[in-house]
Amino acid sequence: MVFTAPCWVPPLPSDLPDSTTLEEFIFCQVKDSQTRSELDRSILICGTQGREYTVQESMERTGRLAQGLSAWLNWPQKSPGKDWKVAAIFNVNCVDFFSISHAIHRLGGTISAINASSTADELEAQLRLSNAQAIFTCNTLLKIAMKASQRVGIPLANIFLTDAPGSYRPDDVYPFQEIDNIVRTAKSSLPLLQLGRGQGASTPAYICFSSGTSGAQKPVLLSHQGIIANIVQINTFEKFRQKGPNISLCILPLAHSYGLVCVAYSALYRGDRLAVLPSSGVEDLLSIVEKLKINTLYLVPTLVSRILSGGKAGRHDLRCVKEVYTGGAPLHPMLGEHILRHHPTWKIKQCYGATEAGTAVSVTSDCDLWPGSVGCLLPGVQAKIVKSDGSETTKHDESGELWVSSPSLAIGYLSNPLATKTTFTVDNTGKTWLRTGDEVKICLSPNGNEHLFIVDRIKDIIKVKGFQVAPVELEQLLLSNDFVEEVAVTSRQDEGEEERPQAFVVRSQVGLEEPQGAVAESLHALVKARKARYKWLHPHVIFVDSLPKTTSGKIMRRALRNMSPANSEVNSRLSSKI
């Protein structure tokens, strides 16, 4: 049984461009659609320094940067081919992310987007995997970038800074090139790159790394056409709600496909003004929202929780906020209810996707909000649910692994044909299906629309005496206890070598006032009263100061499972290194 978008969703245009770069598709389209009075309206806003760029200013900055980099790196402008050029952006969020990306694209190159929280070892590994030959970074990350680049053989001359003068210098010996200086001294502007027919689908615009929550990180190749397709899918789905330009906030890492595609590029394509902000404290975030009167927030569940804790949101005028999108990890229904209690006018929407899918697969619609679901399928997306025996589901409410086909699918994994073949399956009609690894079910809402519900990661399912236990099910129950701020459930063997659900708990303020033993007893009693015996927790509840998470908010269960049994005491604490 193949599932598609609801009938009321407009169809996806059949003529998606296959010879157009991202920059040309988005900025030229926005520029052409602007009226004379809108030409001077900024579309990019730096949330920290206040700098703003119009479409024309952004494209001019990109062209001059491309010309300067071409001369500095000896990278002539030419269509992508065997001489593949890759530059890494290892930086906090900044408006120059787009100038750098599009400048490298004009040279026929690809951007490897690397998370700013990476250590030198992690950065080294990702530079090697992506074959990067240059790095764009900032003052605060320069030492890490230097260490990793020296290990992989990237010359110091190929490290570029996005910050103003006054940056870190090792003994003031090496004069690192700064983006502003390259733009200022460029003698001309390099034009847009003209791709040949079909090159949009075969040319990687970005290398984004999969989350690595259930294994080693893999470099995912996202093509120009694939990203364009996902942008069009999202905006086609949302067309009926659009009422003119919006102001959106991008605080999620641009190195992650959720922040890059769903937030930034989709907002720019809509004609929104996009405020770009590095990851910062909640107070700074809320101050920017209040100051710029941000209408749409794109968050991850952990950031939502931080905003609501301690009454922080109540100290700011947030009446400008109309809707909040969450993605990257499931939003617990109780957290959604908490938001609506404090901000009843906000529309809470979830979206679901994967880097390998080109990002978004489903989004919540204004016309059918259903708490707990991650929305309806986007136009152009086909989905099927495959059970453990290999058969497809034939009705609603049956769970299994989600397989997705979409024009936005990634090209595959870089230099890993085995992983690509395993994850991207081609059927007997020649159609490619992405095996997501997520256990899901599709249910009919009271309004008659098909909604996607995430059950859990298949690899995270716990098997107890032959029965399957979804960690998310227990986590949602445990979160209903007032003593719990956050919780993660993984598997652990008991004394009889049987798997049992193991709870890792971050206590709330109320919970911190109670003895750990009393909190543990309360949690055991709750599960025993509400769940079947095979779902009962392992006797030891592990209390931690924080849960290890990816930047998108996903709990890193693998890190929790790797904790040694010696640490599995009621009063144990997670190492600060996790």
From Swiss-Prot:
Q: What does gene deletion cause?
A: Abolishes the production of AF-toxins and their precuror 9,10-epoxy-8-hydroxy-9-methyl-decatrienoic acid (EDA); and impairs the pathogenicity. Does not affect growth rate, sporulation, and spore germination.
Q: Segment SBD2: which positions?
A: 351-413
Q: InterPro entries, per this entry? A: AMP-bd_C, AMP-bd_C_sf, AMP-dep_synth/lig_dom, ANL_N_sf
Q: What is its main location?
A: other
Q: Which SUPFAM superfamilies match?
A: Acetyl-CoA synthetase-like
Query: Residues annotated as region SBD1?
Result: 281-350
Q: Where in the cell is it found?
A: Peroxisome
Output a single Gene Ontology CC term carried by this record. Answer: peroxisome
EC number(s) stated in the UniProt entry for this protein: 6.2.1.-
Its pathway is: Mycotoxin biosynthesis
Q: Which GO terms describe its molecular function?
A: ATP binding; CoA-ligase activity
| Origin superkingdom | Eukaryota
Q: Which Pfam families match?
A: AMP-binding, AMP-binding_C
Keyword Ligase on this protein?
yes
Motif range (Peroxisomal targeting signal type 1): 576-578
- Record-listed ATP binding positions: 210-218, 350-355, 438, 457, 554
The family annotation for this protein states: Belongs to the ATP-dependent AMP-binding enzyme family.
The record describes the protein's role as:
Acyl-CoA ligase; part of the gene clusters that mediate the biosynthesis of the host-selective toxins (HSTs) AF-toxins responsible for Alternaria black spot of strawberry disease by the strawberry pathotype. AF-toxin I and III are valine derivatives of 2,3-dyhydroxy-isovaleric acid and 2-hydroxy-isovaleric acid respectively, while AF II is an isoleucine derivative of 2-hydroxy-valeric acid. These derivatives are bound to a 9,10-epoxy-8-hydroxy-9-methyl-decatrienoic acid (EDA) moiety.
PANTHER family per the UniProt record, alphabetical: BCDNA.GH02901, LONG-CHAIN-FATTY-ACID--COA LIGASE
Its UniProt domain note says:
Both substrate-binding domains (SBD1 and SBD2) are involved in the substrate recognition, and are sufficient to confer the substrate specificity.
Q: What more does the entry say?
A: Gene clusters encoding host-selective toxins (HSTs) are localized on conditionally dispensable chromosomes (CDCs), also called supernumerary chromosomes, where they are present in multiple copies. The CDCs are not essential for saprophytic growth but controls host-selective pathogenicity.
In Swiss-Prot or TrEMBL terms, this protein is called: Acyl-CoA ligase AFT1-1
- Could you tell me which species this protein originates from? Alternaria alternata (Alternaria rot fungus)
Q: Which gene encodes it?
A: AFT1-1
